[in-house]
Every structure is written in C-alpha cells, then in structure tokens.
C-alpha cells in the first residue's frame, strides 16, 4: 500500500491548478466505468485507480483552438459550468487527457454525430 505521510498536500503549500477529468461510462445493463491504475512510483496518487484527466494547459484555451470545437463556444460551456469564462478549455483538456493518458479519442468526423 502506498502512503503519503511524508508528503504535504496543504493548499497553502501546493498550487491548486484548474484541471479536468473524464468519466467514460458504458450504459449497457451491466454498467461499466473506465478507470486507470496509476503507476505506483508516481508521487501523486501512485497506485490509485483514477479517471483520465489532468491540468488545463495554456494550449487548451479558446483563442488558440481555431475551428475545432464544433460550434461550442466559451460562453456556452462556461455558462454550463457556472464559471465566468474559460469553460471551453476544460472541455479541450478533458478530450486531450483522455487521449494522452488512455488512448481514447473523443472526436468524430466532420458531418457525423457519433463519436
């Protein structure tokens, strides 16, 4: 079992950063949820079962995205999340992290509605 007795996660000491997490759920009758086991050597949550996710990066922000958000705007996504702005960056982060960490690409071809 991994312990963190010698690690300080006090928010006054550790910088808290905006981050996004993805829950992938298969809604068949036997409900399945996709999770990953983190490498035991990882300092933060090593050996733990987690959902794919991670920190919002500068490149995830809307002014750098171009026309890849399929009509979703920062204003729309921010309103859904009840935050003043930056909502679209959380969406982009979730998609990017799902692919980087788990190889799951949450996307569809232009003109298609299915992932």
Ranges and model annotations:
Residues 1-115:
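N-terminal leader/linker segments that precede catalytic domains of diphosphate-processing enzymes
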């Amino acid at each position: 079992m991994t312990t963190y007795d010698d690690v300080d996660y006090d928010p006054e000491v550790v910088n808290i950063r905006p981050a996004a997490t993805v829950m992938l759920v298969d809604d068949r009758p036997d409900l399945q949820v996709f999770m990953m086991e983190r490498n035991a050597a990882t300092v933060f949550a090593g050996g733990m079962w987690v959902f794919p996710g991670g920190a919002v990066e500068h490149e995830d922000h809307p002014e750098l995205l171009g026309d890849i958000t399929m009509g979703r705007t920062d204003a729309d996504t921010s309103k859904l999340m009840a935050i003043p702005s930056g909502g679209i960056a959380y969406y982009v982060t979730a998609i990017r992290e799902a692919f980087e960490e788990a190889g799951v690409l949450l996307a569809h071809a232009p003109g298609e509605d299915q992932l």
